Amino acid sequence: MSFIIDQLITWWQFTVVGILIAIGFIANLFGVDNDKERVGFKYVEMPQLKPIRIPTAGKGFWGALWMWLTGSRHWIVASDWAFRVNGEWYVIPAGFQFDGASIPKFLHTWLSPTGVLLMGGLVHDYAYKYATLKKKDEGTCGPLTQKESDVIFRDINIEQNGFHFLNYLAYWALRIGGFVAWNGHRKVNAKLK
């Protein structure tokens, strides 16, 4: 028994991930909030994304190492991407840059920014930047609050990947810490083109 406890302590990261997976499995098994109305997310094709180079060249050894350890890959939407939320079609225009789901670097081993949270992350980053979504034909959905943007993120990801527990963890992380990015975008006051 002490051997098992020693191993759990030694490999604590995997112990934590294993416990979270078990909780997530139980939550999905019993259908936590499966009957809840979601945003009805649909799309015709995956977004066409082009990676943007991480600028490590010319930074010197320590600067490049710092960029590699703390930076994250950014992506540019290569062509207009249409999607439906709450029965309305919206578009994220070509040229929009984002970093995938904004997952802390130390968690990238288990959760890729362009993995199961990609679709929600793309729509969410656009909603955070502009505080609205651009309708496919013309106009916008009107102003969105930070909470409404976070709910859209959560619901899109639940509809796409079915991992209720993971998506609620991500949602609550946004509710707790997302105000930093939200307020930063409000200061810049980006406008739709």
Task: Pin down the residues of each PLM region.
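Extended terminal accessory/targeting regions
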Residues: 2-193
